Amino acid sequence: MVKDSDEIYMKRCLQLALMAEGNTFPNPMVGAVIVHRGKIIGEGYHHKAGLPHAEPNAIYSVKDQSLLKDSTLYVSLEPCSHYGKTPPCAKLIIDKQIPRVVIACLDPNPLVSGRGVKMLQEAGIEVKTGVLESEARRLNRRFITFQEKHRPYVILKWAQTADGFIDIAREDIGSGPIKISNGVTKTLNHQLRSTEGAIMVATRTALLDNPHLTTSKWSGNNPVRVVLDRRGIIPETNKIFDNRATTLVFTTKEGAEKHLIQRSNYLNQNKIKSIPETDKDLFFEKGNGIKKLFENDNIEYITIDFETNIVKQILDNLYHYNIQSVIIEGGSMWLNTVINSGLWDEARIETSKSIINTGIKAPFIDGIEIKSEIIGDNIIRILAPKK
């Protein structure tokens, strides 16, 4: 087949894969198409972790299985070669005697990482790789970053006025920020949350905005909520502690001790059972280990050193917590800290036409614009780091 037709069928694989966005964690999104003499005879995609992969879904969708011996299988990610929750896809392809396989990109997972291709080639199957590779890697940027860089994919996100401010200067706790996003972009922000592993804010944002950080405006999974609280000053009545989603608090030993007392009082009032005192002691001996302080509670505390490489410490902990992506929403100082660390992958900046003349300056970022979209009176720009 000519290159153009290979790309056409691979585009369809990517379209299929995207249908499961937000549902396949911790697995990547994968789509597969089977073509016989220029006609698509089978399609499939991976719906959810633990369910069949894209390749068997496509293979078993073919009504006349005898046609597989004269067909090409297109798949957006290298077929797996190991036994996990499902059997290896490479073995099924071999068993079905499919003579040609076209792959967009290799799987960076060490359990696969070229082994699927090798297995197919050793069985005499013609294998072609690298068709729409950059598009396929972009689709699974969270999974690939997690596997290759051993940290979550980091998305910076904020809304700013036309004159470069993200908010007015304010001190009233719970007063909420000025309105910059419009109704549509607010909904899209919640849609984004449903596709990412975690969402993070710093102490001041949690105090002043008192945000839920959930997907209340979109039907989907809530991300893990992450908050910085060095001194343990965020009250237990804050919405971020409402148990609607797992919440990780990065703090110090002193901050954790404060939360321990405050949380104990709060949960006892709400008749939630406290864990044994010995387990609480273990937490403090363990240092920066992730530990729940109470039974039936979704709040967990992680102690870190706030004086050294704070961004890396947080990302390392999120990696060990198996979080593949995180949205960092604020505040401006924390966003600038992450930007200056160089440990970010994407910035989503919404700009309105409003002008406020003074307030909290938006973060400074120097990146490459990869996409922009006008939504109502606002424009959303997506930036990537300069290489």
Residue ranges and their predicted role:
Residues 105, 140, 170:
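Short, flexible helix/strand-to-coil boundary loops that buttress conserved ligand/catalytic motifs
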Residues 23, 32, 51, 85, ...:
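Gly/Ser/Thr-rich helix-start
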Residues 140-151:
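Flexible, polar/acidic helix-loop-strand segments at domain edges
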Residues 24-38:
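N-terminal glycine-rich anion-binding loops that anchor highly charged ligand groups
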Residues 117, 133, 137-140, 186-193:
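Hydrophobic, well-ordered secondary-structure segments
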Residues 28-30, 132-135, 330:
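Short, conserved alpha-helical segments within structured domains
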Residues 34-136, 224, 255, 339:
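Zn2+-dependent cytidine deaminase-like catalytic core
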Residues 2-27, 43, 62-63, 153-387:
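Enzymes that bind and transform nitrogen-containing heteroaromatic metabolites
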